[in-house]
Regions:
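Carbohydrate-interacting/catalytic domains
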Residues: 1-153, 157, 162, 179, ...
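Conserved, mostly hydrophobic/aromatic
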Residues: 24, 71, 159, 201, ...
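Short, flexible loop/turn elements at secondary-structure junctions
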Residues: 26-28, 50-52, 62-64, 75, ...
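Core domains of carbohydrate- and sulfate-ester-processing enzymes
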Residues: 75-140, 211-225, 279-303, 418, ...
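Short catalytic/ligand-binding loop motif for oxyanion handling, primarily in non-cytosolic enzymes
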Residues: 78-82, 165-167, 207-211, 271-274, ...
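Substrate-binding/active-site clefts of carbohydrate-active enzymes
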Residues: 125, 160-336, 343-366, 386, ...
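Hydrophobic faces of well-ordered beta-strands that scaffold small-molecule active sites
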Residues: 155-157, 199, 263-265, 339, ...
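Conserved alpha/beta catalytic core and glycan-binding cleft of carbohydrate-active enzymes
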Residues: 356-521, 526, 534-538, 554-558, ...
């Protein structure tokens, strides 16, 4: 076999049409072997003799796409000094563009002996671990272009590749649970009809099913356990894992883009799947443990601000390079449109504390590729000072956990919530305005993958996570949920009716709030997880979206999950209507914060926003401070939008009155005078059916409208 010197850049395996260049960074190694793996179980070892700036490299003519490979790193094994080299372990390339196979868990994939953790384990891991794969970078993108949907037009839909597609009756069996399933016209049609503009995918980077979960008969369904930051997860491919997963993912992105839907990836750059000092040796740990991980003062142990056993070393230039290379790769080569960063506060930890000016954010800010896509932070981690909502730099948007908590509190009847609710409804200026950000920095959500589904939020007071095998100890215990009078399944019609109303309240509030709304997949069908608020390990019907069939009943695959109340197509229709109402009216998705006064240049004497008690008088400070107050009316002035259109034109819109009754009693609302003479009801969450355009009741200033307990009504006045 010919071995040429090759190049130190780019890192990873790079196929050029005639052969492949291999390059891997390691400061810890004495010697590195590239192992080409053959289908008969044998391997050909090639020593990487060339080294530039601690990058070992070689070029191998004739090595083609589909070739499986790994590295064996020879060097010191001294955990007490943070060194864990072990040439018996076949290691994944940190820059692998595809990964083949899965782990067969056993002592072979660990760097130590189970019965003697201080002793190096020299069992060969190759037959038991995954392999890196050389991929062909060439793909016919045609005329693919990123949709580049502006934030004020964006409606996010958080989804799991398998969970969204596994039970869809319109998908061929072989496409369910796959990237190709995402690209199927039946799935795309649902997203388009719902009004979704961006699909936020839960992790699709190559991840690992934990040893502990596999032993329990479970697996890491959510996927927040990355081992390959450049490789699409191979189990989501419908037709092979020797690079086919890359082509299938690209094809899915191309199809979604053709439909005008952006693809945003949930990425986990805060830790890896190698766990703590008792975790397996799969890649980074054996290549250069000191360079990749944050270690404690006793370097045999790992610092953990993620709750997973380890944290990547964010002050290491090689970790930062890997993350930035990964982000650029997914944008330039895979054509994704943005990222949601899991536990993003960890990315700001150069040292112990969270630093919003850390090197990572500097690198993102100046990067001509990454800085131009959507950047969404999950603005917290489990370390000290990790809750950082409102503290990310101006380029970033954030999952607004305070929005979620406040909206939940309002509709479950918590006292003293109106003032904060007003802030959340109008874009959370208290969090974002001072540093020059706009309402669009707030990603508003009521539910997401982590926690109760929308159905379960109104059906359970307590978590029911027994199926996870941890005696219901896992998952959040403070859910701000309310079961409407009965825990879980019930035949009580009044409870069921109230639950339906509450779900409509949450959807309507979300879609009528300033900021960027995010729907959790299946909530439009009232998907239930039977009270499990931490279904990270439930790769089964509990987590998969149940779709209606053509007749509107339960989807193929049987009845609804045990105890479920069926597929709610009425809620889907309501959700569609609210999404499209939002999309059609710029006053519901302003790019600037409200002023609370008349806007200069609009020739309108009315404020751009006004707040009223149910009696129709403007709110006073005493009203805001009232512990019992749980109802109000909001006036949104469509004639007082301060921001111009894309060509500098003045934007005008219809005006709206949003009436909220979060109390346990019916309340008579007076339509405010002096803010418009004639109005029409366009949304009423007390009614199970979705209103047809123009069919709502007409009312005039001074009229009374009775809102039943825990309901919401929206009035519209033409511009």
């Amino acid at each position: 076999m010919q071995v040429w010197p090759g190049e130190a850049y780019p890192l990873g395996a790079t196929y050029d049409g005639a052969g492949t260049n291999f390059a891997v960074f390691t400061e810890a190694a004495d010697r590195v072997e590239l192992c080409l793996l053959h289908d008969d179980g044998s391997e050909t070892a090639v020593e990487l003799r060339e080294s530039d700036a601690f990058v070992r490299h070689a070029y191998l003519p004739g090595v083609m796409p589909g070739q499986r490979y790994g590295f064996r790193v020879h060097g010191p094994y001294d955990p007490g000094r943070g060194l864990r080299c072990n040439s018996a372990k076949l290691l994944l390339d940190p820059y692998a563009k595809a990964v083949s196979g899965s782990i067969r868990w056993g002592e072979e994939v660990y760097g130590y002996h189970f019965d003697d953790p201080e002793r190096r384990n020299d069992l060969d891991s190759a037959p038991h671990t995954m392999a890196s794969v050389v991929v062909n970078p060439y793909f016919d993108w045609g005329d693919d272009r990123p949709p580049r949907t502006e934030y004020h037009h964006t409606v996010l839909y958080e989804a799991h590749v398998k969970g969204l597609t596994m039970r869809h009756p319109g998908l061929p069996e072989e496409l369910r649970g796959t990237y190709a399933g995402l690209a199927h016209p039946a799935v795309i049609e649902h997203l388009r009809e719902l009004g979704v503009t961006a699909l936020e995918l839960m992790p699709v980077h190559q991840f690992v099913n934990d040893h502990r979960l596999v032993d329990m008969g479970l697996n890491n369904y959510w996927g927040y356990n990355t081992i390959g930051f450049f490789a699409p997860h191979n189990a989501y491919a419908s037709w092979g894992d020797r690079g086919q997963q890359v082509l299938e993912f690209k094809s899915a992105v191309r199809a979604l883009h053709e439909a005008g839907i952006e693809v945003i990836l949930d990425v986990v750059y805060n830790h890896t799947a190698e766990g703590n000092h008792l975790g397996p040796t799969l890649s980074f740990k054996g290549i250069d443990n000191l360079s990749y991980y944050r270690l404690t003062d006793d370097p045999q142990y790992y610092m953990d601000t993620t709750g997973t056993g380890n944290s990547l070393l964010m002050r290491s230039p090689h970790v930062l390079q890997m993350i930035m290379d990964s982000l650029r790769y997914w944008v330039t080569e895979m054509h994704v449109d943005g990222f949601r960063f899991d536990l993003a506060a960890t990315l700001a930890r150069q040292f112990h504390e969270v630093d919003r000016l850390s090197s990572f954010f500097d690198l993102v800010q100046q990067d001509p590729v990454v800085s131009q896509v959507k950047l969404i932070a999950e603005p917290w981690d489990v370390g000290e000072g990790g809750y950082q909502v409102g503290n990310f730099p101006p380029l970033w948007t954030e999952w607004n956990g305070k929005y979620r908590d406040t909206v939940r509190d309002l509709w479950r009847g918590e006292q003293r919530t109106l003032a904060e609710f007003a802030s959340r409804l109008t874009g959370s200026s208290d969090l974002y305005q001072d540093d020059g950000r706009r309402p669009l920095a707030s990603i508003n959500f009521v539910t997401c993958h982590d926690g109760f589904t929308l159905h379960d939020l109104v059906s359970y007071n307590d978590k029911h996570n027994e199926a996870n095998g941890e005696d219901n100890r896992d998952g959040e215990s403070h859910n701000r949920s309310w079961n409407c009078g009965a825990e879980g399944d019930t035949d009580d019609e009044s409870v069921l009716e109230l639950r339906q109303r509450q779900m409509r309240n949450f959807i309507a509030t979300l879609m009528l709030s300033q900021g960027v709304p995010m729907i959790s997949h299946g909530d439009e069908f009232a998907r239930t997880q039977q009270g499990n608020n931490n279904a990270y390990c439930q790769d089964n019907e509990l987590s998969w979206v149940q779709w209606p069939d053509e007749e509107g009943g339960a989807g193929e695959g049987g009845e609804a999950a045990e105890g479920a109340e069926g597929v709610d197509t009425g809620l889907r229709d309501f959700t569609r209507a609210l999404v499209w109402l939002r999309r059609e009216h710029p006053v519901l998705r302003r790019r600037r914060f409200f002023h609370g006064r008349p806007v200069e240049g609009t020739h309108d004497d009315l404020s751009d926003i006004a707040w009223f008690t149910p009696e129709g008088r403007e709110m006073t400070q005493q009203d805001w401070d009232s512990a019992q107050a749980s109802a109000l009316t909001v006036f949104l002035n469509g004639n007082a939008i301060s921001e111009p259109g894309t060509r500098g034109e003045r934007v005008t819109d219809d005006s709206f009155l949003l009436m909220f009754n979060a109390s346990a009693e019916p309340i008579d609302f007076v339509v405010p005078v002096d803010h418009g003479r004639q109005w029409q009801v366009v949304v009423d969450t007390a009614k199970p059916e979705t209103m047809q355009e123009g069919s709502g009741k007409k009312v005039e200033a001074g009229d009374r409208l009775t809102l039943v307990d825990r309901s919401m009504t929206v009035l519209q006045r033409p511009a």
